[in-house]
Amino acid sequence: MVPKLFTSQICLLLLLGLLGVEGSLHAAPQKFTRAQWFSIQHIQTTPLRCTNAMRAINKYQHRCKNQNTFLHTTFAAVVNVCGNTNITCPRNASLNNCHHSRVQVPLTYCNLTGPPTITNCVYSSTQANMFYVVACDNRDQRDPPQYPVVPVHLDTTI
């Protein structure tokens, strides 16, 4: 009985450790609000090559992010989407703070192609015009006061 209990405890610790790591990968670096981090990760008014564009994100996370989507629009335009009807987030049904864009935007999808080394993360890119769904929250006191509700998570593209 003792070996089974010990094995179960080890498995539980490993699972909790993995969940902790996964949660921390989605958190904003401490110096940024969630909206600021959203903007860094997902807003790019002028398309750049993925390998170059991803450097800023990877620098703060100290790893090569596997994939990322850049919306080629403005932060203000995405804030306006936060005013659309609340929906359940397609990728996380426990959240109901998502909002569907009414118009398609040009975007770039970046996908890590090679074995990741933090000094040389190489990405392929795919361009498309798509709708998107963002999660929005009340602004942090460090966010611009003209935006009472701000995007904090790109949930999916459609």
Curated annotation (Swiss-Prot):
EC number: 4.6.1.18
Matches recorded under InterPro entries: RNaseA, RNaseA-like_dom_sf, RNaseA_AS, RNaseA_domain
SMART domains hit by this protein: RNAse_Pc (SM00092)
Modification sites for 3'-nitrotyrosine: 60
Cited function: This is a non-secretory ribonuclease. It is a pyrimidine specific nuclease with a slight preference for U. Cytotoxin and helminthotoxin. Possesses a wide variety of biological activities.
Subunit structure: Interacts with and forms a tight 1:1 complex with RNH1. Dimerization of two such complexes may occur.
Protein name, as recorded: Non-secretory ribonuclease
Organism field: Aotus trivirgatus
Gene coding for it: RNASE2
